[in-house]
Amino acid sequence: MEIRRRPPNPTVRVENLEYAVPHREAQAKNILEEIVWHKDIEIKNFKKIVSLEDLIKKIENLPAPKDFYKNILESKIKPGVIAEIKKASPSKGVIRKDFNPKDIAICYEGLGASCISVLTDKRFFQGSYEILETVRKSTNLPLLCKDFIISAYQIYKARVSGADAILLIAAILSDDDLIYLKKIADNLKMSVLVEVHNDNELERILKLKSFNLIGINNRDLKTFKTDLKTSIELMNVYADIFSKQNILPISESGINCAKDLESLRSIGIKGVLIGETFMRESDIEESFNKLFYSI
């Protein structure tokens, strides 16, 4: 699935200077492309408020990032849990009306989550970097900044806001982009979870030989439907490679019940990223216990 970058000039001038119409190539072809295109605008707006240089200065006084990989590897719960804080999504709208990031973070840590993922995209997921900052103050767990990262600026902003790890999505980044952004994260001692959706993307990532956390997203980017077959089919082919290269495979999305969890555990999945299953329930603790302790 090809995700194009936003055209530099999304309109075509018509007759007088004050008239313009959208160019046909300036229309996003799917929701993921729309999100990525909006990131260009969002990043420019962020830079007007805080420069990259100012972010770098702030990082100098921060404590070292927490070890995301180690927390999943040494988790008492198997597979390790990356519990997500997410208010809304493009496909479901508002998922959790009673949304208190501080209370959710404290709850997750008390239940034994290995790490916490925080949505920071505002327009499509109603997240923010302010939420990430709130969660940082509320828990000692490693935090993943869950965003659609296309720029080094976002990585520095995530670090300043309290993130220990970032998400890179193979579908929206070239190999050169992936290598460059990974180097930025490495320089900041941050962990990187790289996300794939199919075998072509996974092959790309393995050839780069740069990542030890690979997330297999079970969500179809065209339909936004989830199917655990994505994780199962890829693990059937690549489990041995992951093991030999000390790569932790993480299954993301569509994990709804204890049976799903057992299926993933049995094929060698080392971590699971779960958000909506917890967010849609009024009692997160009950939902968590039902998922991990009912077998």
UniProtKB/Swiss-Prot annotation:
<keyword id="KW-0456">Lyase</keyword>
<comment type="similarity">
    <text>Belongs to the TrpC family.</text>
</comment>
<comment type="pathway">
    <text>Amino-acid biosynthesis; L-tryptophan biosynthesis; L-tryptophan from chorismate: step 4/5.</text>
</comment>
<keyword id="KW-0210">Decarboxylase</keyword>
<keyword id="KW-0057">Aromatic amino acid biosynthesis</keyword>
<dbReference type="InterPro" id="IPR001468">
    <property type="entry name" value="Indole-3-GlycerolPSynthase_CS"/>
</dbReference>
<dbReference type="GO" id="GO:0004640">
    <property type="term" value="F:phosphoribosylanthranilate isomerase activity"/>
</dbReference>
<keyword id="KW-0822">Tryptophan biosynthesis</keyword>
<protein>
    <recommendedName>
        <fullName>Indole-3-glycerol phosphate synthase</fullName>
        <ecNumber>4.1.1.48</ecNumber>
    </recommendedName>
</protein>
<dbReference type="Pfam" id="PF00218">
    <property type="entry name" value="IGPS"/>
</dbReference>
<dbReference type="InterPro" id="IPR011060">
    <property type="entry name" value="RibuloseP-bd_barrel"/>
</dbReference>
<dbReference type="InterPro" id="IPR013798">
    <property type="entry name" value="Indole-3-glycerol_P_synth_dom"/>
</dbReference>
<dbReference type="InterPro" id="IPR013785">
    <property type="entry name" value="Aldolase_TIM"/>
</dbReference>
<dbReference type="GO" id="GO:0000162">
    <property type="term" value="P:L-tryptophan biosynthetic process"/>
</dbReference>
<dbReference type="InterPro" id="IPR045186">
    <property type="entry name" value="Indole-3-glycerol_P_synth"/>
</dbReference>
<dbReference type="GO" id="GO:0004425">
    <property type="term" value="F:indole-3-glycerol-phosphate synthase activity"/>
</dbReference>
<keyword id="KW-0028">Amino-acid biosynthesis</keyword>
